[in-house]
């Protein structure tokens, strides 16, 4: 099963560190995949949830263990063109990633290609899913 850290969080939410490149690198070094929030402004990539915060290079996003959530349409188009694993959604309950995974809310129907996003606990995971994304991903090891 793919274990995905939500914005770099491993054992609980640390909002002030989320999407910080060093925080993300730490989660990657511990062996987790990481979901990050990506913006593109004036042809430059940034990380940040509510706004662009951390300027990054395209090469950072090309890590195969990153799941890049495009926060604006420019970021989505640029990442698709650069063959970076990404997805885009606003109010949708399920989003299709550029590698064919279903990024799905816990309450939704799951398949073998589904990533279960933010389940209430590690004991409540649906059967036969591809992976899970959580602020508490360390509890799933």
What is each PLM-predicted segment?
Residues 1-141:
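Phosphate-group recognition and catalysis centered on beta-loop-alpha active-site segments
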């Amino acid at each position: 099963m793919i274990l995905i850290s939500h914005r770099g969080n491993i054992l609980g939410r640390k909002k002030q560190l989320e999407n910080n490149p060093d925080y993300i690198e730490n989660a990657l070094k511990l062996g987790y995949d990481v979901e990050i929030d990506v913006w593109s402004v004036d042809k430059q990539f940034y990380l940040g949830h509510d706004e662009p915060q951390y300027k990054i290079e395209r090469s950072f996003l090309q890590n195969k263990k990153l799941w890049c959530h495009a926060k604006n349409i420019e970021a989505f188009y640029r990442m698709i063109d650069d063959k970076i694993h990404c997805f885009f959604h606003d109010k949708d309950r399920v989003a299709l990633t550029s590698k064919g995974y279903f990024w799905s809310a816990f309450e939704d129907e799951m398949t073998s290609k589904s990533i279960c996003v933010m389940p209430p606990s590690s004991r409540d995971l649906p059967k036969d899913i591809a992976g899970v994304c959580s602020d508490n991903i360390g509890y799933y090891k």
